[in-house]
Amino acid sequence: MTELARLKFYATQPHSCSYLPDEQATTLFLDPSQPMDVNVYADLSEMGFRRSGDHLYRPHCQNCNACVPARIPAARFIPNRQQRRILKRNADLTVTAARPAFKEEYFELYRRYIETRHADGDMYPPSRDQFSTFLVRDLPFCWFYEFRLEGHLMAVAVCDLLPNGLSAVYTFYEPDEERRSLGRFAILWQITEALRQDLEAVYLGYWIKNCKKMNYKTQYRPIELLINQRWVTLN
């Protein structure tokens, strides 16, 4: 473990919760003057922290603990029947790793995805600046995994490659290809990639029981949830 006790953190003032509309949220951030060290990041991921842009954060709400960090233990994951069908359905896709960069091809896919799937969220309307600030960061552990069908870009999974696992930062994909379930396939691929690289887990971010958009995360079993500072397995 790195010397986490020496790190500085800052809590925000209460603000509107992005997931539960009737709640106020407080967020704890790692001091932005602290260099984005991959080992610090890995240790903090074990404690439920996530990355957004250049910042590491986790919920720090006084009266709510609905945001539960979730990860998939790669070596113990067993795909169910539906997930096996998704893998078969997308066997014609090729995946390549690229360094983070702004490309019109990326942004156009991201724009269509946000406008179609998340027009009710705080990421709408999408812009080039927003896309770059959120995802295009010059970090040595960040990768854009491109999913293509005969050269056509179908999805991009933005992932952080950590010593203890893959952290799924964000995935955007072709919104008109519903039958392929590209978002679910991207997670299945990341589990396979974690196994290939002998990594422990795929970190999915936060699961919220009363948020329908989060329900998909518990479809991957077993899954581990960080409860009372312990990773608890849900089979």
UniProtKB/Swiss-Prot annotation:
Its main location: cytoplasm. SUPFAM superfamilies: Acyl-CoA N-acyltransferases (Nat) (SSF55729). The keyword Acyltransferase applies. It is found in: Cytoplasm. Belongs to the R-transferase family. Bpt subfamily. HAMAP family: Bpt (MF_00689). This is Aspartate/glutamate leucyltransferase. It comes from Pseudomonas putida (strain GB-1). The gene is bpt.
